[in-house]
């Protein structure tokens, strides 16, 4: 019977990790330099945009981040940013004095296939 204790403890921890902090499948995450680098890499590369993503913005700062584990990972960046007129202006804003708004940028990453896609850019609610 004592061999069941570690197994039950592992199951309890797994259930806790699986269910904790999930709202619509997303969990809040502290923004790391690696997360910001991922945002910059995807958001500044127009070929990484899904064809239905027509918004073009630069970002001033990352306000917060949520992640969702799927067949890879979805990153929902809540950013302050500005509309831009050309793909050359994507990524971090060169003009720090632009008229900013709040946006949500969702990036899908699957590291084992080197997939990095901007799946949506929407005005934040």
UniProtKB/Swiss-Prot annotation:
CDD domains named in the record: CY
Coarse class of the protein's main subcellular location: secreted
InterPro entries the record matches: Cystatin_dom, Cystatin_sf
Coiled coil: none
Positions of the record's site feature: Reactive site: 25
Superkingdom to which the source organism belongs: Eukaryota
Any one Gene Ontology cellular component term annotated for this protein: extracellular region
List of glycosylated residues: 45
Annotated localization: Secreted
Keywords: Glycoprotein, Protease inhibitor, Secreted, Signal, Thiol protease inhibitor, Virulence
Renumbered ranges of motif Secondary area of contact: 68-72
GO molecular function, one term: cysteine-type endopeptidase inhibitor activity
Induction of its expression: Expression is up-regulated during infection of host tomato.
Signal sequence residues: 1-21
UniProt function note: Secreted effector that interacts with and inhibits the pathogenesis-related papain-like cysteine proteases C14, PIP1 and RCR3 of host plants. Inhibition of host proteases by a pathogen extracellular protease inhibitor forms a specific type of defense-counterdefense mechanism between plants and microbial pathogens.
Family listed: Belongs to the cystatin family.
Subunit record text: Interacts with the host papain-like cysteine protease PIP1. Interacts with the host papain-like cysteine protease RCR3. Interacts with the host papain-like cysteine protease C14.
The name this protein goes by in its record: Cystatin-like cysteine protease inhibitor EPIC2B
